[in-house]
Amino acid sequence: MRLLITGTDTGVGKTFITYNLAKELKERGYKVGCLKPVETYVREVPEDGSLLSKATGQSVNEIVPVRFSLPLAPYAATLEEGRDFALEELGKHYEELSKKYKFLLVEGAGGIAVPIKKNYTYANLARDWKLKVLIVGRAGLGTINHTFLTWYYAKATGLEVIGIILNGFTGEDVSERTNPQIIEEMTGIKPYKVPRIQDVELPKDIRTGLADYVLSRFTP
């Protein structure tokens, strides 16, 4: 399984979902690895990469091969920081991990149209690396438009979206009651609902359901 976990926006919980999915798969005995090709806003140690390493046991260096200090899209970070990286080297690293792990979860930065390099987005990367797509979006007001546009763009660029995760259900936002139904009607994909929690680790039943949801929708 080779999967791009992308978001409808920044801060929607991609790393949180990737961590819990990876942890559950590993606990089931699968050989699972994570890859965050580029992490920005890194001060000393990559925060997202460090969390993912706790789920899989990988080194942070293996998970995050490219890092920038500014909180920007990868391409913007290359412009602001005056340094670059080679897509070819990223591709080689991906191929190495693909051979090493049965399940490889690739976490994007921001959304699927975020540029990694000039004229090269995460949608391009998913196409070139032959990744299927899992979308993570917010549970509340505004998520219908954001989720539909992400799904539509992915489909328009020839990608296969296998699932939609709506993250952060509180029970307080009235839109949460109808958002999943409407998104399913618009995309044909039944979203998986994840509650808002204070901890980084989902309750076991929710985590199990998350992994079952993804595995049931994935056809090699």
Swiss-Prot record:
Gene name as annotated: bioD
Described function: Catalyzes a mechanistically unusual reaction, the ATP-dependent insertion of CO2 between the N7 and N8 nitrogen atoms of 7,8-diaminopelargonic acid (DAPA, also called 7,8-diammoniononanoate) to form a ureido ring.
An individual GO BP term: biotin biosynthetic process
Active site residues per record: 36
Gene Ontology terms: cellular component: cytosol
Molecular function (Gene Ontology), one example: magnesium ion binding
Assigned keywords, A-Z: ATP-binding, Biotin biosynthesis, Cytoplasm, Ligase, Magnesium, Metal-binding, Nucleotide-binding
Cofactors: Mg(2+)
Residues the record lists as binding ATP: 11-16, 48, 107-110
Residues engaged in binding Mg(2+): 15, 48, 107
Binding site for substrate: 40
Localization (cell): Cytoplasm
Keyword hit for Magnesium: yes
Leading EC class: ligase
Known catalytic reactions: (7R,8S)-7,8-diammoniononanoate + CO2 + ATP = (4R,5S)-dethiobiotin + ADP + phosphate + 3 H(+)
Coarse class of the protein's main subcellular location: cytoplasm
Coiled-coil region: none
Subunit structure and binding partners: Homodimer.
InterPro entries in the record: DTB_synth_BioD, P-loop_NTPase
Name of the molecule in the record: ATP-dependent dethiobiotin synthetase BioD
Protein family: Belongs to the dethiobiotin synthetase family.
Enzyme Commission number(s) from the entry: 6.3.3.3
Keyword ATP-binding: yes
